[in-house]
Amino acid sequence: MAATSGNGQEPMDTSSSLLDLEAYLTNYTGVTRARRLAFIASVSPPHKRDALALAAAEVKRTTNTALYLELVALSGDDGGLSRDDGWVEQVDRKAQQRLDKLESDLNGHKTSLVKESIRMGHTDLGDFHYERGDFNTALKCYVRTRDYCTTSKHIIAMCLNVIKASIQMGNFTHVTNYITKAESTPDGSDPTLLAQLRVAAGLAFLEAKKYKLAARKFLDVPPELGSSYSEVASAQDVALYGGLCALASFDRAELKAKLIDAPGFKTFLELYPQVREAAHDFFQSRYASCLAHLEKLRPDLLLDLHLHDHVKQLYDDVRSKALVQYFSPFVTVDMRLMATAFNVGVDGLEKELAKLIMDKQIAARIDSQAKVLHARHADQRTATFAAALKMGDEYMRDTKAMLLRINLMRADFIVKGEGQGIGPSKSSRQEARATAPFHPAGIDGLMAMEGP
């Protein structure tokens, strides 16, 4: 059974996913638990009923009635979720009372002009709206605390609050801006803080489809992250996002240095052994095994809140890289053997190779009759001579330009503004003639352009 991704574009086959929802939830805290379950329910019919039940139970521990009503609407007739109007009315009434108190307290703090109290008042209001699921209002409250921050710790707390609200909204421009602000504060070098900021930066680059930059951020996350950022992403997510983006974008040397042999990231890879095995298989040129590992992961990855829109592109990039890397050492390749190595049919492989050739990722031509791929290697000797001639021409041009400049300077020859004449004065000419100019025609030759 297939569903459609959150952006309505990518078909998502999640029927073979064996995701244990209750075990999955243990990796997260806060509002992201219910939001991830709601997303799973929206894209995976096989998981819809269980995900909705867990999400509704999770939401009822909070004051987020808006998300609860979304879950009820998503449930429809077959989701098994009925609307609890009594709970909604009770929570909304209590929430309004708390909101009135928070706003009253904030007004009192503004009257007293105590900056710390005003900052805390805005933060409490932001936390209230964040729990209610009104991330836009929460963001505005968090941003207002900026004018009342008196220490670097206050600035960092403000930045982290803005970042988490912006991530929930999908506003990654704000995320990037406030990451930079947090990193520039005096206390911005704390390992746990750096870990959280790098995770947020990785998510921003992932959303922008800048997979290489995303991989570098995720792979630079220190082990101190632990579960400190589970309201946004888990340590398992770091291993998954970082490993997959690295496989899709890193070259062989960078993959080994920054992923496979990186001592800091090994801690994360231990949490996701399938990604570790896929990376090792890719580096060891066991491409069929690597791609098989990734295919087993695909159904679960399509259920991920942040990764789902990128799975197809990332997988295509990994496969293209594998094909290019397999072919690169050879002059000719038997496509039948290559098809066996990639566990694919020859006709299908030929179409993939043709696309890579058209995209100029492989310099080769296909012999469809013999099923052989021939490399198109450039004539290195001709290329070397051409480069040498080009360098010589550039040297001659630069030398002539320098000689001309020297002669002009010796002649005191300048171009002045309109109406002020051209060239040096008579005395300057006489002085120039007393020197030994480089110009083969002499100074008079240079001055000939002046006229009498």
PLM-predicted stretches and their roles:
Residues M1-I155, L160, K164-P452:
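Charged, E/D/K/R/S-rich low-complexity terminal regions of large eukaryotic assembly subunits
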